[in-house]
Amino acid sequence: MIVVDTSAVVAIAFAEPERESFVRMIEEADKALMSTVSVVEARMVVHGRRGQRAVVLLDDLLRLPMFEMVPPGVAEMDAAYAAFVAYGKGSGHPAGLNFGDLFGYALAKVRGLPLLFKGDDFSQTDIARVGVHHENQRSSR
């Protein structure tokens, strides 16, 4: 089981170079959790770049049986705020997590699961990355 960030589903939706490896990692995980806040963020990004028809295709992807949408509860709320203080935009930390990032981070943190993402922002935090052992991730920085 893994948590999927907005950046990963957007990369899949837009057929970016990471698409095939991200799809493979999701399939290998059997279950891919995604914060409902991250889903809204993904819809916003896709709509902004490609319009509503692309959002319909994104929603079709997220309806596949391996995806489970998880609304934030109190634990995720607290973890998202803690992540904002430690890693959020304006905190001075190089990760500079945005609002949507905080909820993917929080879901992964609360569930103790690795996060599938694109980019370098999360790799500058303490969250485990899908396919990378946490110790290796930290030492490669």
Listing of model-derived features with the role each one plays in the protein:
Residues 105-141:
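Acidic, PIN/NYN-like endoribonuclease modules and their adjacent C-terminal/linker elements
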Residues 19, 39, 55, 77-81:
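A general structural signal for well-ordered alpha-helical segments in protein cores
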Residues 49-53, 86-89, 132-136:
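Short, hinge-like loop/turn segments at secondary-structure boundaries
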Residues 1-34, 47-60:
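Short, well-structured N-terminal submotif of metal-dependent ribonuclease cores
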